[in-house]
């Protein structure tokens, strides 16, 4: 496995651009994008979770520092850096790739949407200089990692919980080979859980539920502002000239001006990434304790609250039901072992779905952030 500048074996799908000479953008990707963004004096453009846009036919491109880029072109920028780093570390030319893909992409309502997302991803690899690309369902790849240590065949249910999707595969694996018995998935996972925390803990302190207006006519603050705040791959959309102008006018029309001012400051000072870091810290702490202290103090924005795990589980109840539905559709009677991977598999309420159906003794996990990559390599 390659190891990157932050010491990890995973490469975050994040890009950061700043204007340089001749108005051309200079790009950083992965861990270096985060470092450059946090250290920059004049903020450029941070772009995250690009895979979440692949199934969307309405979002073909976006403007970055005066130039339009397609989603495929942006992903290709990241892939070129990743390929160059692999070539540097391993000393060989990299022209082929085995790539994990979710069972169901975020926003994909039909098989045609999924096929569209895969084709866009394939185009991105082509733009990045790859000559041959093979795709594998991510939970199937994780199954390959698990099966490498088996001495006898087992029926295995794999649950892969990423940022944007929860994916499941049922397979027969072991020395006798691998047989895929079924796939299912849903376009929600860790990012959705983060969004619930923002909606219930953060957004009320930024004016959600407040009203604005004058001359005796009051209207609620537009909810779409908070919907974009909740989804970290939409944060950059809040920084458009039109939206910033709207946000700047809201405190003067609001019954809670200090909260709307905090919302404007958060967006104008480009604090969204740090906000999501604070939310994710709280989510991780709730996996270890019955309550956690949410604290966000950046610039002029101060938010603090105690969050109870019981409340968090109530906020994500519908999401948990959707995940459980995937498991139940695949069937539970014949499963010998359950293998869980991905950061969201640490959430107690998620693990409880599997413990209630299979018993804790049949559940295993390990290499939660790299098992898919290991499985893809073993299958190559």
Language-model region placement:
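Short beta-strand scaffold segments in enzyme catalytic cores
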Residues: 13-16, 167-171
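Short, glycine/acidic-enriched loop or turn micro-motifs at the edges of active sites
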Residues: 141, 163-164
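Alpha-helix capping/termination and helix-coil
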Residues: 205, 283-290, 323, 327, ...
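Short glycine/serine/threonine-rich phosphate/pyrophosphate-binding segments
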Residues: 164-168, 373
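N-terminal phosphate-binding loop and flanking beta/alpha elements of the actin-like ATPase fold
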Residues: 1-11, 19, 23, 28-158, ...
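Phosphate-binding glycine-rich/basic clefts of nucleotide- and phosphate-handling proteins
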Residues: 173-298
